[in-house]
Amino acid sequence: MAPIGVLTALDQARTQYYHFKAIVIAGMGLFTDSYDLFCIAPVMKIVGRVYYSDGGARPGVTPPAVVSATVGVALLGAVIGNVVFGALGDRVGRRRVYGACLLLMVCSSVGSGFSVCRTRRCALASLCFFRFLLGVGVGGDYPLSATIMSEFANRRTRGAFIAAVFSMQGFGILASSAVTMAVAAAFDHYTGYPAPLDTPECADLAWRIILMAGAVPAALTYYWRMSMPETARYTALVERDVVKATNDIGRVLADLDLGAVAEEEVAAALSRPPPPPRPSYGLLSRRFVRQHGRDLFACAAAWFLLDIPYYSSTLFQSQIYRPLFPAPGLINAFQEAFNVAKFQAVIAVASTIPGYFVAVLLIDRVGRRCLQMAGFLLMAVFLFALAGPYDGYWRDHGAHAGYIVLYSLTFFSANLGPNTTTFILPAELFPARFRSTCHGLSGAAGKLGALVGSIGFLWASQQKDGAAAGHLPGIGMMYALFVLGGICLLGLALTYVFTPETMMRSLEENESDRAQTQVGDGGSDTEAAKSPASMASSHLSMSPILPARVSV
């Protein structure tokens, strides 16, 4: 199957400035996602001191049910956002929906800081509401960021570009820690370093500033997001306007003779035999399941299995930093939040960000499938190493360097492998008219796994006898870690059996291979787009093909 000329030009384009600009623009949603995820832990320390200092079993400590609610509503919103905005990205267009997601994230981040009511219950309910909306926006950004980057990238470095977009999560963690530490230190100094059990009224302002700060980088990129053209693959394959696609690419990519590309494509379209009709099968139809069901299952199941141990490990941090810092009863609210953020920054610098960088370096050399299997295997090994001697040694030696190293290596392995590859693969395996939707479905499955991991781990890690206040008895930390390691091995087996390799293959080749296994009901989207009708501008108006370059 001969490819469309403009898509061939995209696959062969050299790496240039616009690619790196697109990485930053597309990565801001992931930046906001990790900022929101990691700032909530220190924020809830301050919230506990502000709203739960008047008695109770543990004064100054946010109840587990409230912590679970603030985490859970954002993840639930992300499930909905993945599905809804993923589908809209295929139906309305990537660019327009992209801007809507960003506005929702900005408004809900600001709204989280304005969760002001007269009662504690009302204030926290308002916070959960805005965090739900934030989750919807962040969830919608997942499929759109990955799809846009995959459709702009060239074949040779596509994996590295998408992985670089995803690596913005690491910088979001650092930003979250830096902002939290700066705000906490400033308020601590301004209030004269209050006593441990003395929480100034201005602490109610501190946590709001931390939450609202997440809106700033997202808001700064709104103009550039709306200046981006629609992706050429969406315009050519879904809207079936190859000339407009060529025109759009001419605005942003340099050193491509797009006029010649368009002339050749028009001539070829007029001389070639009529293409097969555009495929008419719908999402989750029988033909879709035959052609793409296996890939959708592989992507969704792997993401679901990954996020259970990944988000559980995030909550597991409290078991590690607790022995390293003074007890909460010996420090004030600002100092406690500062210590939590400081530990998160150390883990990010030592394991999370290096894992992303190694993934960017290896993804187009080793391949997605191998990295995903290696990551799952290493995660299982390190979780088992934490679990085996936990009751006999680690529980009483949590500050031991070996304990922290094993925990850090778990995050490194996740980001080196499945945490990155599960974001990349759904953006490469499906036809253009289903790409954003299928990525959204896969991402929604991942966030469901995150819900299971976040809420389930809080219960499972409790001891059968003597569970922490507010928790039901669980199976204990040691057995919970063994379960997480077993889930990683299941992810390894699933990847080996079901996940295909997409390295060094164009997006159209992935679609074509699956379309060739079917007969009837039309051909692939790429073949259908090669009709003279899609060249509606024809030879009479080729001047728009070479517009003046614009900066976007």
Curated annotation (Swiss-Prot):
One of its GO terms (biological process) is phosphate ion transport. It is a multi-pass membrane protein. One of its GO terms (cellular component) is membrane. Residues 44-68, 118-123, 180-203, 317-342, 391-397, 461-473 are extracellular. GO terms for molecular function: symporter activity. It holds the Pfam family Sugar_tr. Residues 507-540 are annotated as: Disordered. Although related to the sugar transporter family, it does not transport sugars. Belongs to the major facilitator superfamily. Phosphate:H(+) symporter (TC 2.A.1.9) family. High-affinity transporter for external inorganic phosphate. This is Probable inorganic phosphate transporter 1-10. The gene is PHT1-10.
